Each structure stands twice: as C-alpha cells, then as structure tokens.
C-alpha cells in the first residue's frame, strides 16, 4: 500500500511539516493544516496553502522523500521539477526539465530512484525554476 503524505510550510515560522492534509472552512475562509502524531496526540499546524505538496511515493538515492514541486538532479545531470499530473482519466507524478526543453528526463531518470537526488524545491529555491542556474 502506498503512503498518502503531504508537506507544507507553517504559517507561524516557515518550517516544513509532513503529515496528513486537513482542509477546513472557517466562516467562508478555507484554511489548510498538516496533522501529525506527536507522542500520542494528533497535532495540527496551519500551513501556507500554496506550499502544500503531495509525496510521490519514492525516495531519492539518499532515502529522502520526493514531493511534488521538489527539484531533483538526475544521474545524467538533468535538473527537473517534480509535478503532479491530473486529468479526467488518471493522476500521477512526472518530471519536467528545467534547463532546456531538449533535456527532458527520460524513463531511466524517473523509474530508477538511485538516479535522482533532491536539490531543493520550487518554494525555497525559486531561482532554479525561473532560470538556467545550475547546481
């Protein structure tokens, strides 16, 4: 069975938290929370809605969990952003090349986790998404 896990940046201090996604309406406002177990209590913290990302179900070569909007570097030097693809027929994750449209990832980059490592995410490292900056 696959893990359903989300990550988001806390509103109060900007730290990343992982857990279950809780979406609540308060007097017309929609607020997002990440819930997690602390000792024996369920704790929830409010997160910035735009930063909520879903775990794609694999880890990189360093056993770090890969979430949508993470920026990964492949064994072959390609810099890619992990994206969630949603259509009427299916939902899945994919990677898009950031450096050049001609350097799109191939199937070896995506399906062999030892070929990937997380170098950041699009929220903490927006320059990597907007430019051809290399790591």
Q: PLM features: what roles do these ranges have?
A:
Residues 1-135:
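Secondary-structure transition motif
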């Amino acid at each position: 069975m696959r893990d359903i896990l989300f990550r988001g940046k806390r509103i109060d201090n900007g730290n990343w938290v992982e857990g279950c996604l809780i979406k609540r309406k308060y007097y017309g406002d929609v607020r997002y929370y990440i819930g997690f177990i602390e000792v024996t209590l369920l704790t929830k913290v409010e997160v910035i809605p735009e930063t909520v990302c879903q775990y794609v179900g694999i880890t990189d070569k360093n056993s770090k969990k890969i979430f949508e909007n993470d920026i990964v570097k492949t064994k072959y030097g390609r810099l890619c952003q992990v994206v969630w693809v949603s259509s009427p027929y299916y939902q899945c994750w994919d990677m898009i090349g950031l450096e050049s449209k001609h350097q799109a990832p191939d199937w070896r980059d995506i399906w062999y986790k030892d070929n990937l490592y997380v170098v950041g995410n699009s929220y903490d490292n927006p320059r990597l998404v907007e430019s051809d900056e290399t790591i």
